[in-house]
């Protein structure tokens, strides 16, 4: 992929670390990667991967509320910039991904 990783990294809590990934090829998408540590959630890696849909759905709903209400981010959505979020485990297992776009802010 034509991506460049800008390592914030930012610990959101003891279980989740945020990385910002800037996609050079497509200027309309800003990507973020979340690394989730199963142990710090009180789960095994197997339990985390088994419950990945629930975690992905919960994070997506959180981001919809957040991105659509923070004025500077909402402005980016309104001009056609999308946000792509990928979630991986600390052991590099795929957990989920989703995109937030302008249409997600329409009730």
Where are these regions (language model features)?
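Low-complexity, compositionally biased segments
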Residues: 5, 57-60, 107
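A short amphipathic beta-strand at an alpha->beta junction
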Residues: 60-96
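N-proximal, solvent-exposed amphipathic alpha-helical segments enriched in charged/polar residues
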Residues: 1-29, 37-40
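A mature extracytoplasmic/lumenal domain signature
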Residues: 34-40, 87-91, 100, 104
């Amino acid at each position: 992929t034509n991506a460049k990783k800008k390592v914030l990294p930012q610990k959101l809590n003891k279980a989740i670390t945020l990385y910002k990934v800037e996609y050079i090829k497509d200027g309309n998408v800003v990507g973020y990667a979340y690394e989730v540590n199963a142990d710090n959630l009180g789960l095994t890696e197997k339990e985390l991967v088994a419950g990945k849909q629930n975690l992905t759905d919960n994070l997506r709903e959180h981001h919809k509320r957040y991105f659509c209400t923070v004025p500077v981010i909402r402005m980016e959505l309104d001009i056609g910039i999308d946000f792509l979020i990928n979630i991986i485990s600390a052991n590099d297992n795929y957990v989920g991904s989703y995109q937030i776009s302008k249409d997600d802010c329409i009730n």
